């Protein structure tokens, strides 16, 4: 089992991974060529834009089995998918069996899901999602079972860890970040890192299938707004990234003029030895947790610091992280 640790109101340096360094760095005013991370959005499905469930995009399929699937109206998100199974029997699922993500091409994989666990009667387990390789081995898992009070995940085989609180009948943003090279992953719920650097259920060098499902005696109802799976190549050239309260997460982040805005954006990126992450002086990020992905080495650390003039930036790490 993995040790669990709560981080509440700690200093910024408490959440830095191995090979990271806190410092203040002057801004270089010249132009710098930056190698862009090669990112491929492998598959995405967004039910809010759909009129019906016919002809789903990008190899997504729904299997009703002993359950029922509907495109329903939601007061917050418009159209969403409702998957409901009230009796034991065959599997109901939303599935994509053609991810075709291989370690020799992509190192990092992120799965972002906007989901609501329904308050309808439920029993046992609903998988949200299970991810398999081309041989059918289950490599990564996230699921709800029992009284649906917390998400759970398998690590090192079938050892189980809690992976964040379930807010029944409320929309939650769930993100899984997978490192195919290290066979590790992390889970973030609504921007808070709940599991980090934990081992996969099974080691693999590829991902083939993702499935949200309930089968056999498992019952319950879930609502899905969208799912996005992104495979990303590893960067080889270090760079400097900027973060500002006046930034824009849709921009490159590689200059003060194209700075990112949120810690969520920083936390979603993969940093390498020699990278610098600089926060603008005078800025403040409240009730957010900084937990960058990646690590440096003895000779070339990842530097977290500041740029500009004025008061040093403030970050309130008022979240929870399990390691």
Stretches found by the model and what they are:
Residues 21-39:
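Sec-dependent signal peptide cleavage junction
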Residues 51-85, 294:
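Extracellular glycan-recognition surfaces and repeat-rich motifs
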Residues 67, 71, 245-291:
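Acidic Gly/Asp/Thr-rich repetitive segments characteristic of extracellular carbohydrate-active
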Residues 82-148:
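Secretory/extracellular carbohydrate-interaction modules
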Residues 151-173:
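Short, aromatic/His-centered strand-loop micro-motif at the edge of beta-sheets
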Residues 170-180, 185-187:
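Short tryptophan-centered beta-strand motifs in secreted/extracellular beta-sheet-rich domains
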Residues 197-225:
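Flexible glycan-contacting loops in extracellular carbohydrate-active proteins
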Residues 293-323:
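Right-handed parallel beta-helix/beta-spiral solenoid domain characteristic of secreted/periplasmic
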């Amino acid at each position: 089992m993995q040790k669990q640790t709560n981080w509440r109101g700690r200093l910024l340096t408490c959440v830095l991974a191995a090979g990271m360094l806190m410092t203040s760095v002057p801004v270089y005013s010249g132009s710098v060529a930056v190698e862009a991370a090669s990112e491929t959005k492998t598959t995405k499905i967004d039910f809010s834009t759909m009129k019906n469930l016919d002809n789903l995009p990008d190899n997504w399929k729904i299997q009703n089995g002993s359950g029922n699937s509907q495109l329903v109206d939601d007061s917050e998100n418009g159209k969403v998918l409702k998957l409901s199974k009230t009796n034991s029997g065959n599997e109901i699922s939303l599935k994509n069996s053609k991810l075709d993500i291989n370690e020799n091409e992509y190192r990092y994989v992120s799965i972002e899901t906007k989901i609501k666990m329904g308050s309808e009667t439920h029993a046992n387990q609903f998988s949200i999602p299970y991810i398999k390789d081309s041989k059918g081995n289950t490599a990564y898992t996230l699921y709800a079972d029992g009284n649906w009070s917390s998400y759970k995940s398998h690590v090192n085989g079938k050892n189980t860890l809690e992976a964040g609180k379930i807010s029944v009948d409320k929309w939650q943003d769930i993100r899984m970040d997978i490192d195919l090279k290290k066979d590790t992953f992390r889970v973030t719920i609504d921007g808070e890192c709940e599991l980090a650097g934990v081992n996969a259920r099974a080691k693999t060098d590829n991902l083939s299938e993702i499935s949200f499902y309930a089968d056999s005696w498992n019952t319950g109802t879930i609502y899905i707004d969208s799912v996005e799976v992104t495979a990303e190549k590893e960067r080889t050239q270090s760079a400097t990234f900027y973060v500002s309260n006046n930034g824009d997460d849709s921009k490159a982040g590689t200059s003060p003029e194209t700075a990112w805005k949120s810690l969520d954006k920083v936390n979603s990126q993969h940093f390498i030895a020699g990278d610098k992450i600089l926060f603008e002086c005078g800025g403040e990020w409240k009730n957010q947790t900084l937990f960058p992905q990646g690590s440096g080495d003895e000779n070339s650390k990842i530097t977290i610091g500041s740029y500009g003039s004025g008061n040093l930036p403030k970050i309130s790490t008022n979240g929870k992280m399990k390691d």
